[in-house]
Amino acid sequence: YMRQVANSWNRTEPWSQQDQAYRLYVLALAGKPDLAAMNRLKETRLQRPVSQWLLASAYALSNQQEIATKMIRDLSFEVTPYRETGGTFGSTTRDNALILQSMVILNMQQDAYRMLEKISKAMGSGNWYSTQETSFALYAAAQFVQKYLGSQKGIDITVKTNSGNENVKTDKTIWQKQLVLQGDKASVTVTNNGQGSLFVRQINSSAPL
């Protein structure tokens, strides 16, 4: 059915373009890409960045990585704030989640992490989100974790600071260390001894004089 609808599609409205891009993305996810319909959509002037992200994902899933890479070159990560109360019930957060899915498929790990942070901050804000927004956000986050952290079992790192080296091995996935200033400087080097991805965040704080 989806292939039939994809082949008969001939609209140009932004929302319809996004519907078609998502349709082709799902077909590619199912291992049944429709390259003819994908090529037709690619030749259309896509009016929403998320449509381009979805179509690029469809190409990547169809072993057309070169085309996918060209499509996302200089493509915006930003979604204009909006919320639909009908149609696809789209929103900024829902579209960010779709872009995160695309980034994971296209192996854009650093960009995907920043998008995951943005989505996590939004979902943790206490604002109301629809079931669709929540489900897309959780699904995209799960894809990120599965690809980049799925095989990781805890943390195995070496931390070098002003006071020496420290080997840290724990089953936990989060570890914190407070650095002590020596004079007005504190330096740290973290070496990942494990097989999975490691994300390091430095948080600075000070008291006014």
Regions found by a protein language model. Name each.
Residues Y1-Q4:
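Acidic/histidine-rich catalytic neighborhood
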